[in-house]
Amino acid sequence: MKVIFSVAVLVLASSVWTSLAVDFILPMNFHMTGELLQKTKALCIKNIQLCWILSYFKVSEPICGSNQVTYEGECHLCSGILYEDRTVIKVHDGPCEHSSDESEH
């Protein structure tokens, strides 16, 4: 009985954690500024390691970048900033209205 209870608690705890697991929060703005880009980059550097963990538990929600590209989530936007030297910030949650997919760029 103790084993079943322990497994049930473990499953419940991981389910709750997974449902609460969200990509980290990035600032949003329609106008790019150097200060906002630096703040976004600093948050990306601080949180990029979470992306590996989050990718196993949760599908990311699309976000719109200031370059009118729809990214698969904050992790993908940060990857572009940190590893592809893109100058982009998050504009809003959800896909861009007139966008090409991030994978095309």
Curated annotation (Swiss-Prot):
Q: Which cysteines are joined by disulfide bonds?
A: 44-78, 51-75, 64-96
The UniProt record lists the keyword Membrane: no
Which superkingdom does the taxonomy of this entry point to?
Eukaryota
Q: Name one GO cellular component term.
A: extracellular region
> Tissue range of expression?
Expressed in epydiymis, in the cauda, corpus and caput.
Task: Output the InterPro entries linked to this UniProt entry.
Answer: Kazal_dom, Kazal_dom_sf
Keywords of the record: Disulfide bond, Protease inhibitor, Repeat, Secreted, Serine protease inhibitor, Signal
Annotated ranges, domain Kazal-like: 44-98
Return the annotated site residues (Reactive bond). Answer: 53-54
Signal sequence interval, chain numbering: 1-21
Record's subcellular location: Secreted
| Any Pfam family the entry gives | Kazal_1
Q: Which GO terms describe its molecular function?
A: serine-type endopeptidase inhibitor activity
- State if Plastid is listed as a keyword: no
The function of this protein is: Probable serine protease inhibitor.
The name on file for this protein is Serine protease inhibitor Kazal-type 8
Q: What is the lineage of its organism?
A: Eukaryota, Metazoa, Chordata, Craniata, Vertebrata
